[in-house]
Amino acid sequence: MDVLSPGQGNNTTSPPAPFETGGNTTGISDVTFSYQVITSLLLGTLIFCAVLGNACVVAAIALERSLQNVANYLIGSLAVTDLMVSVLVLPMAALYQVLNKWTLGQVTCDLFIALDVLCCTSSILHLCAIALDRYWAITDPIDYVNKRTPRRAAALISLTWLIGFLISIPPMLGWRTPEDRSDPDACTISKDHGYTIYSTFGAFYIPLLLMLVLYGRIFRAARFRIRKTVKKVEKTGADTRHGASPAPQPKKSVNGESGSRNWRLGVESKAGGALCANGAVRQGDDGAALEVIEVHRVGNSKEHLPLPSEAGPTPCAPASFERKNERNAEAKRKMALARERKTVKTLGIIMGTFILCWLPFFIVALVLPFCESSCHMPTLLGAIINWLGYSNSLLNPVIYAYFNKDFQNAFKKIIKCKFCRQ
């Protein structure tokens, strides 16, 4: 996804592929040795980390059975795509950046641009597929359990590559301008205005809009469920504090005769403290049926309280039980709010990283072909925009896998070579 053709004039690209900036032509003699060394180290480190990170994700899914599900198949396919970007595209892009000119010939240039557009577009569309899968899972959890099959995942993955091919192939079939190959030292994508609109909207702007809509709805659905849980907790707490359940009405009295009088379980501790009752029945001095309950107070003392059977039902809610329920309700409410904050944070990281990496590139890619010679892009800024887009292939495994505890456990096994021993 080279946005800037190093050291060149004002040509452009669309989806992931080189474009050039306006200004004076910079020859290869202007590239210093220190620039080449520093740039090589920086880009080499980025490429190495991208290869290692995505390879670990693929290995974790392949070796750990608990990770082999439909959701992780999409993440694994994303890692394979980003691995292809890191292995097939980034080395040539780094060479182009370090030398400040294209030295591999026109055929290799065409192949480089096609791979660049194909892999980067597919990577972006994989993010859409993951968002779509999550949207279905959270908005239709019952029915989607049966629909969430490997076949559906394969269909989504195939669709991302198909769209990538449809965007990357047209320039090779002639959808370009005569000026695209006029400079042998530059490797640029088609600057045709129609292709620029077609490629930028197909590779980024439409997927961006889709992801914003999907993650917006995911957030609303998640927040609705969380707040519904909070309301249930609050209602349960209120019922515990203020509600009363009537005492049971046995069909027979102690002596076996049918009785219409209610039994009461009302307990008061004269000394105060928390109470816990365990009932038994015996005969009173006047012949009335009495229920004896053993009362355990906080002070470990015991007393027996006779309860006359004539009395009507009287609610009893021990203070310690009420306080415990209040504490539980408050804890659940805090957990629910914490889940909502985590949801906001996760979705913010996903969308924020995607927009930060790709939006600058695609703004420039869409605008520059229409500016002709009136627009000027500083060389350094163009290089930063190019590699900011490429760095998304490094960040994707961090966002979608390394924050996941199941993946973390699999990575630890890989590091400790537990899979090798098995």
UniProtKB/Swiss-Prot annotation:
Keywords, ordered alphabetically: Behavior, Cell membrane, Cell projection, Disulfide bond, G-protein coupled receptor, Glycoprotein, Membrane, Receptor, Transducer, Transmembrane, Transmembrane helix
Transmembrane segments: 39-59, 74-98, 108-132, 153-174, 194-216, 347-370, 379-403
Superkingdom of origin: Eukaryota
Chain ranges for the short sequence motif NPxxY motif as given in the UniProt record: 396-400
Disulfide bonds: C109-C187
Bilayer topology: Multi-pass membrane protein
Regulation: G-protein coupled receptor activity is regulated by lipids: phosphatidylinositol 4-phosphate increases HTR1A-mediated activity.
Binding-site residues, serotonin: D116, C120
Motif DRY motif per record, residues: 133-135
GO biological process, one term: regulation of hormone secretion
Residue ranges that the UniProt entry lists as topological domain Extracellular: 1-38, 99-107, 175-193, 371-378
A GO molecular function held by the record: neurotransmitter receptor activity
Keyword Cell membrane tagged: yes
Region called Disordered, residue ranges: 1-23, 235-262
Entry's Gene Ontology cellular component terms: dendrite; plasma membrane; synapse
Compartment(s) where it occurs, according to its Swiss-Prot or TrEMBL record: Cell membrane; Cell projection, Dendrite
Assembly and oligomerization: Heterodimer; heterodimerizes with GPER1. Interacts with YIF1B. Interacts with GPR39 and GALR1.
Physiological role: G-protein coupled receptor for 5-hydroxytryptamine (serotonin). Also functions as a receptor for various drugs and psychoactive substances. Ligand binding causes a conformation change that triggers signaling via guanine nucleotide-binding proteins (G proteins) and modulates the activity of downstream effectors, such as adenylate cyclase.
Family recorded in the similarity comment: Belongs to the G-protein coupled receptor 1 family. 5-hydroxytryptamine receptor subfamily. HTR1A sub-subfamily.
Matching PANTHER family: 5-HYDROXYTRYPTAMINE RECEPTOR 1A, ADRENERGIC RECEPTOR-RELATED G-PROTEIN COUPLED RECEPTOR
Protein name: 5-hydroxytryptamine receptor 1A
Species assigned in the record: Gorilla gorilla gorilla (Western lowland gorilla)
Gene symbol of the encoding locus: HTR1A
